[in-house]
Curated annotation (Swiss-Prot):
It is found in: Nucleus membrane; Cytoplasm, Cytoskeleton, Microtubule organizing center, Spindle pole body. Interacts with BBP1, MPS3, and SPC24. It is a single-pass membrane protein. The chain crosses the membrane at residues 311-327. Pfam families: MPS2. Component of the spindle pole body (SPB) required for insertion of the nascent SPB into the nuclear envelope and for the proper execution of spindle pole body (SPB) duplication. It comes from Saccharomyces cerevisiae (strain FostersO) (Baker's yeast). This is Monopolar spindle protein 2. Signal peptide: none annotated. GO terms for biological process: protein localization to spindle pole body; spindle pole body duplication. The keyword Ion transport does not apply. Residues 216-235 are annotated as: Disordered. The keyword Secreted does not apply. One of its GO terms (cellular component) is spindle pole body.
Amino acid sequence: MSNGAFDAIFEYAWGQIDKPISGDFIYGKDLPKLIEIIENIFQKAQKSGSYELRLPLFSEINKDLFRTFSNTKTFFKIHKEEFDDIFFNLVNHPLREILENAFIGVDSIPSDFIVSMNLNSPSKFLVENKNKNTEGAGISTPRKKLTESPIKLLSRXNIGKALEVQVEELKRELTAKQSLLQENERQVSELKIRLETYQEKYASIQQRFSDLQKARQVEDNQNSSRTSDPGSPLVTGIDQKAILEEFRRRLQRQTDTISFLKDQIRRERGLNCSNDKVSHSKRKHATTDGDGTFKNFISAVPSNIWVKATIRIIVCFALLAGVLPYIRKYVYAHDTPSQNSRLQLSWWENSGILSKIVWFFEDQTDLETEYRSNANVDDAYSRVFGI
């Protein structure tokens, strides 16, 4: 196994990133760039056709890990002595093993790999490192910087100012990241609160839905029980508001109907008196053609004259009632009684004028009785329905 070739590759890639002023370390943000430089070396070797290689060296998952590390630990200092441990923790394999396994048919990196690639690396370092590896196998030598650091050329004040500027930048970045972290934590807490609220609403809606399903089942059971057994008592689980609203609606409709009927009765009392008299007289018996003439005559006569005429008629009726029995006795003495004599009309019913007078007074009495009955009915409805 050629440790010198691996060290040379690593030193070359490290030297492309590590600057003398940085102090022999690179930042976490430079890790993907270091891996890219190493991978470019092997891609160049494969294109030249000198070696058979297994490429790519790193999978996309490993590259994602490198990028994540660079984003989360941007200014994390990676020293050479700590690189192997950090790399192993990321991909669970050492970098040396990955590079050695890239060569097909060879168990290690060939010693002439760096020379054949003509890398811009000091040849003196390669020779010294190679001699040390051949002289003492298994003895690891510390890595040295290939170029002389220009820090010696700068004054201590300039170095201090540069470090102060770098520290201030790091502090500002740290403050910005802390603010961003606090904002993210606040958003996370708000999202948690909203999530709890939505969960409570969902639980409430689910409970209401379950209650509605149970109510629907109870209602279906009630309908089926009423269909099968009409005499069974109703279950008291129905919405009381809907029942009361339906009762109010029906009561209002009934109240309107009663009011309309009462108004109609009041109108009929004043307008249909004469018509009621005629209808009652027609229900009693059939009259002659002179009925209409007599009715018109009564309605045309003034009330005072009508009263006087009524008194005179009554007197005449009394006289006739005393005289007519004697006349009837002599007129109908020789008539034989018929089988239907009990169905014959009275003597005063055979006279059109007398029957008119009698039926007029009877109809007037019936109308007054009917009006009193209607008034009693109206009062009863008013008391029942609170009108």
